[in-house]
């Protein structure tokens, strides 16, 4: 009863290789249903994101190994000779479970603690469940992974603290001003970085966001998406600097777009009410001399990266707690797997003893009285339970490092001459 995981991720393969292995939702469904319908797997699921494509399989044949699955997906995607087995990782049994628990907990992510991955794991399971390729094992594995991720999020700080420049900027603004809903924000630049910063601001309850961009249509599109519908002409935004508590700049330029003199004038109009400028440009958008203006807080990318590094360091310090949670859940999952493995043997063992008992009782059915027969049945039941107690207890006991469940099952089946079980997995 094995579970195999095989795949490529940011640790094992460069992006050009990962791109050639990735699966769309349609391809995902075709792949997993193909594995099951061909009798290659009892169960199958694929997790495919920008950073990883991972296959989770309960094999239906002894020939289905990690190497087999690597070759299978390379062929399925027609990935070419450049994609080789060494670009893949392989995990088996509890190693597969540990890997999925680590992925779901965001400690195997490109950015430690990046919380988006859990939603992607849930989506992978949804697809497999929808096409009915997630059976009892993968269903239990995934739901345990979801539980692990929830415990990690609530019991540790692995996901706390900004680890992107745009989010770090917003987090810093919130620390300075506390309630962003009461502040007026100017976003200069509606490119990818500016858009992310605006969306993070909106998520932190900032609603009074004004956008300016060289191309007005981009300003209007972002403002409409946020629901603010507030834009300023790029040519005249400097005339309004004094109106804003928070200014975020994210434009591509070789010249400073805000000078010390401009901010000094703006601060006089504000009567020195504090302003924070978050310069997300590279090269910098704001003259560093602006920081000399009274009540002006200027933070550029280097300052924000220092915050990010500190946050990542704190997240790394939470790893022992995360691993402890994973270890705890891994033991519970392993014990559940073991109960599935031993259940047929326990049933067969009990059935064999009941059959022996009934045959022996039948031999005396017409030789003794009904009362004596009842006593014999009662006595043989007690003897049978005492004989079976130890082997059943041994089968149910936790696995030690020097033991294995298959060896226990084989031992009991051989000693008591039980036929090989007919199992679906």
UniProtKB/Swiss-Prot annotation:
The active site is at residue 50. Substrate binds at residues 49-52, 109, 114-116, 120. One of its GO terms (molecular function) is glutamyl-tRNA reductase activity. Its EC number is 1.2.1.70. Keywords: Chlorophyll biosynthesis, NADP, Oxidoreductase, Porphyrin biosynthesis. The record marks 99 as: Important for activity. One of its GO terms (biological process) is chlorophyll biosynthetic process. Pathway: Porphyrin-containing compound metabolism; protoporphyrin-IX biosynthesis; 5-aminolevulinate from L-glutamyl-tRNA(Glu): step 1/2; Porphyrin-containing compound metabolism; chlorophyll biosynthesis. It catalyses: (S)-4-amino-5-oxopentanoate + tRNA(Glu) + NADP(+) = L-glutamyl-tRNA(Glu) + NADPH + H(+). It is an enzyme of class 1 (oxidoreductase). PROSITE patterns: GLUTR (PS00747). NADP(+) binds at residues 189-194. Gene3D superfamilies: Glutamyl-tRNA reductase, N-terminal domain, NAD(P)-binding Rossmann-like Domain. PANTHER family: GLUTAMYL-TRNA REDUCTASE. Possesses an unusual extended V-shaped dimeric structure with each monomer consisting of three distinct domains arranged along a curved 'spinal' alpha-helix. The N-terminal catalytic domain specifically recognizes the glutamate moiety of the substrate. The second domain is the NADPH-binding domain, and the third C-terminal domain is responsible for dimerization. During catalysis, the active site Cys acts as a nucleophile attacking the alpha-carbonyl group of tRNA-bound glutamate with the formation of a thioester intermediate between enzyme and glutamate, and the concomitant release of tRNA(Glu). The thioester intermediate is finally reduced by direct hydride transfer from NADPH, to form the product GSA. Homodimer. Belongs to the glutamyl-tRNA reductase family. This is Glutamyl-tRNA reductase. The lineage of its organism: Bacteria, Pseudomonadati, Chlorobiota, Chlorobiia, Chlorobiales.
